[in-house]
Amino acid sequence: TYVGQKFQDNNPNAALYIHAGSGQLDQEAAADAVIDGGIKYMRGFAMNVSSSGTTPVEEEWAEQFVKTLEAKGVAGKHYVVDTSRNGVALQGDSNPGGKFLTCNNPTAAVGTRPTSNTTGAHADAYVWAKPVGESDGVCHPGDPDAGKFFPDLAVKVVQNGVTAGTIEYWE
């Protein structure tokens, strides 16, 4: 709450979005968390940061979440979707040896390039919030620590995006 209020007081033109998680979360619990976090001082919420939920799934959840927030007295909120790793729907067996499905998953693919051309009624933009190639941590033997640049993963995730058709190859 403090950060949102300070930004609003000192830079009212800043568009802030609080992370609301991803489309697997319980709407009521997520709403309580972002309300406690000060969403009333922000433009809205961010979806799917560092995760792999597909854009249609995340937008469907987010559009319902806007209604959940309205029912709790917080109206007029918008959202952004992190598409940096959601170019393909990841399957439960697509990250063999990985700690979690999304942890440095070599089958992940970049999704839609950042744009304000969205399909959700309350979606402001698709963004790449998680830097492509940033390690989630030592998920497989030899992976770098969390937050370190991981060139092999960056190349693979971009190549997968080109193969999936979520981005085009530039020469």
Question: What feature does the model see in each segment?
Answer:
Residues 6, 10, 23-156:
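Surface-exposed substrate-engagement region within the catalytic domains
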Residues 167-168:
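Long, compositionally biased low-complexity segments
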Residues 3-6, 13-15:
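A non-catalytic structural micro-motif
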